[in-house]
């Protein structure tokens, strides 16, 4: 389901632990890492889609997390044409996402990447809050930065800024 502009409605999930580190998932049979995310089905609310995707991709249930906040508006990214399925070319531009910031209230052992028959991730780790901005695939980078900035400024008081984090990184990591 695409909107009139060619964007697929989607939710993104930033899951943090008690140290404000983020869940970073390794895609099945790939060397790429990303936050959990997935499409919103027709008639489904963003929050319902978020809980469904959280279970499908991470194996966590609502009792394992607390919603800290969400982005105010949709954040969009365009997918390069060579990444778009042939049958979608011409109509599909990318994703529009509502991002949720969740705090893990359960334990690390509650994470189950094999909760469904079609896992999205085959590995995961806790990562520094800002590190995914520099590690995610290029076309998602701006949306990751925008989501992390908005959610940290509104809901995580005292969080180091991305600019301060980036200034401390070796120049080869940016």
Curated annotation (Swiss-Prot):
What Enzyme Commission number(s) appear in the record?
3.6.1.-
Q: Which domain of life is it from?
A: Bacteria
Q: Where in this chain does the entry annotate a coiled-coil region?
A: none
Q: Which GO terms describe its molecular function?
A: pyrophosphatase activity
UniProtKB keywords: Hydrolase
Q: Which cofactor does it need?
A: a divalent metal cation
Q: What is this protein called?
A: RNA pyrophosphohydrolase
Output the lineage of the source organism. Answer: Bacteria, Pseudomonadati, Pseudomonadota, Betaproteobacteria, Neisseriales
């Amino acid at each position: 389901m695409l909107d009139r502009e060619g964007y697929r409605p989607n939710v993104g999930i930033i899951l943090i632990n008690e140290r404000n580190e983020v869940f970073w998932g390794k895609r099945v049979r790939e060397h790429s890492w990303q936050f959990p995310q997935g499409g919103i089905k027709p008639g489904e609310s963003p929050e319902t889609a978020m809980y469904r995707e959280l279970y499908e991709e991470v194996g966590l249930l609502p009792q394992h997390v607390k919603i800290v906040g969400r982005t105010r508006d949709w954040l969009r990214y365009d997918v390069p044409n060579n990444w778009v399925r042939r049958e979608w070319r011409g109509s599909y531009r990318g994703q529009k996402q509502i991002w949720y910031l969740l705090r893990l209230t359960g334990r690390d052992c509650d994470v189950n990447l094999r909760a469904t028959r079609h896992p999205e991730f085959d590995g995961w780790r806790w990562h520094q809050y800002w590190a995914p901005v520099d590690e995610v695939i290029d076309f998602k980078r701006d949306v990751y930065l925008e989501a992390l900035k908005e959610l940290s400024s509104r809901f995580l008081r005292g969080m180091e800024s991305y600019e301060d984090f980036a200034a401390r990184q070796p120049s080869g990591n940016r």
